[in-house]
UniProtKB/Swiss-Prot annotation:
Organism lineage string: Bacteria, Bacillati, Bacillota, Bacilli, Lactobacillales
Name of the protein in question: 33 kDa chaperonin
Coiled coil: none
Signal peptide (from-to): none
PTM entry text: Under oxidizing conditions two disulfide bonds are formed involving the reactive cysteines. Under reducing conditions zinc is bound to the reactive cysteines and the protein is inactive.
Organism, as annotated: Lactobacillus helveticus (strain DPC 4571)
Length: 296
């Protein structure tokens, strides 16, 4: 089953729901960054949550960046999602595995630690907008919900799931984001939350073949309306040309050292792990572009 996101609405048109399956997205991140179990769970949940947030809020060529800045062993987690539902991300420490909790689950809360959750949205305005809330749970889903409720005043419920196999590959990944629209009654919200609490573990459901459409009907009822279905993917827009532009910003003395001492340079993209090698001659060409500039 390919990765995709579904948007739906309940029969009263007062509850909006986004549901997603993202096994391949998280699997690609796991392979690119060689993630161990705890790191895979943290980055995976953040990737899924960021895609749900992008699906709910972005249009045109907008993008958002989620920074989960916890003091746990995984370290900061950075994810960027685009309006076309392409996502990329990384954790500072990819090789973290922790003792499981008593129920056998990965201790995501311990891996994340305490800190802040920041969401920066580039909506094509002069300045990006950043909202910030404390990490209240560390389980990540609750932290996204807290951000939406406190920073954006949108009453929300979020569920995120990543199942990591014993060999660190990804067995499943997915989740949901429920948002109450202004006309939603307390009774409607209460009834829907009861449905969510009655759900079996999302990981079990996705492993058993549940689709985003299935999850939407379980949460909103079988009479909900499916509005939209869109593919999602792990994708990075880095390139050798972009990194050459970064090299051009270095001082001439630094470029000369790379040429004369290192005889080349290799840069690695944090988001996707792609490596870009520059030969001496390529570095000389970059240095030549700077010759008309005043070097400080």
């Amino acid at each position: 089953m390919s990765d995709y996101l579904v948007k739906s609405i309940d029969k009263t048109k007062n509850l909006r729901l986004l549901t997603i399956t993202a096994k391949d997205v998280v699997g690609e991140a796991q392979k690119r960054h060689d993630l161990w179990s705890a790191s895979a769970a943290v980055l995976g949940r953040t990737l899924v949550g960021s895609l749900l947030l992008a699906g709910a809020e972005l249009t045109d060529k907008e993008e958002l960046t989620v920074r989960l800045l916890g003091n746990g062993p995984v370290g900061p987690t950075i994810v960027t999602a685009m309006s076309d539902l392409k996502v990329k991300g990384y954790v500072k420490n990819p090789h973290i595995a922790l003792s499981p909790k008593k129920n056998g689950h990965i201790d995501v809360k311990k891996a994340v630690g305490q800190g802040m959750l920041e969401v920066t949205k580039d909506l094509g305005l002069k300045e990006p907008y950043t909202g910030q809330v404390p990490i209240v749970s560390g389980e990540i889903a609750e932290d996204f919900a807290y951000y939406l409720t406190k920073s954006e005043q949108i009453p929300s419920a979020v569920g995120l799931s990543v199942f990591v196999n014993p060999n660190n590959s990804i067995g499943e990944a997915g989740g949901f984001m429920l948002q109450a629209l202004p006309g939603a009654s307390d009774a409607l919200i209460t009834e829907t939350i009861k449905r969510i609490k009655a759900l079996p573990a999302l990981s079990t459901e996705f492993l058993d073949g549940m689709t985003p459409e299935d999850l939407a009907r379980k949460i909103l009822g079988t009479d909900c309306k499916i509005l939209e279905k869109d593919d999602v993917a792990f994708s990075c827009d880095c390139s050798k040309e972009k990194y050459a532009g970064i090299l051009e910003t270095l001082k001439s003395s630094q470029l000369k050292a790379m040429i004369n001492e290192d005889h080349g340079a290799e840069l690695t993209c944090n988001f996707c792990g792609n490596k870009y090698h520059y030969t001496e001659n390529e570095l000389k060409d970059i240095l030549a572009k700077k010759k008309e500039e005043k070097d400080y």
